[in-house]
């Protein structure tokens, strides 16, 4: 049974997250329906990351096992043909190596959070950025983010309903930069806790707005207490932009 590796892009707004839902639209459900329309096979795909409601992706990776040995280009063309009414696009398709798994073979996940930092609200990117009217100090945000890098107990930045067995994670990259009218926050790690990126982002915005100091972020991290977290950033500006497999 050949396994296909798919690179996927989607707008998260129409979906109740990536994971299949019994009665609500999902990215997983859209892709699985496209597979069935293509070859008649009912499948269960696996993904590198199960993004929440409203979270977008430009670099999600999934795999699908098919009964027939189809050319990868045929899979690519067919799935996109059956996804035209969805906010989902297959960017590439290839036959996966033996033993490769979209989730368990991943050793790096990269997220981008976009903040539109201007007075005028977004017209074209509504629902794709977090709009902040107040000028944010991105340099202070970046300085505070450096306290988050490394191996830590991230209980403060962990959603109360997170199912991860341990709150301990290693954050490899935490970077804040200004790009025109936007502030971009980049985070990279092998894996993240539920809503960890949005929790860290919302907290760093408190620093940028002058309501928190750089050292307040360090203190919040060390408190290991969810009540010490800043406001959780909305899903709108969050993107899964890449997954690494050491290849």
Curated annotation (Swiss-Prot):
Superkingdom of this protein's organism: Bacteria
Transmembrane annotation, as ranges: none
Keyword hit for Disulfide bond: no
Pfam family, one: PseudoU_synth_1
Active site, renumbered: 52
The keyword Transmembrane appears for this protein: no
Coiled-coil residue spans: none
BP GO annotations: tRNA pseudouridine synthesis
GO molecular function per UniProt: RNA binding; tRNA pseudouridine(38-40) synthase activity
Residues involved in substrate binding: 111
Record field: catalytic activity: uridine(38/39/40) in tRNA = pseudouridine(38/39/40) in tRNA
Protein task: Formation of pseudouridine at positions 38, 39 and 40 in the anticodon stem and loop of transfer RNAs.
Protein name as catalogued: tRNA pseudouridine synthase A
The species this protein was found in: Caulobacter vibrioides (strain NA1000 / CB15N)
The gene coding this protein: truA
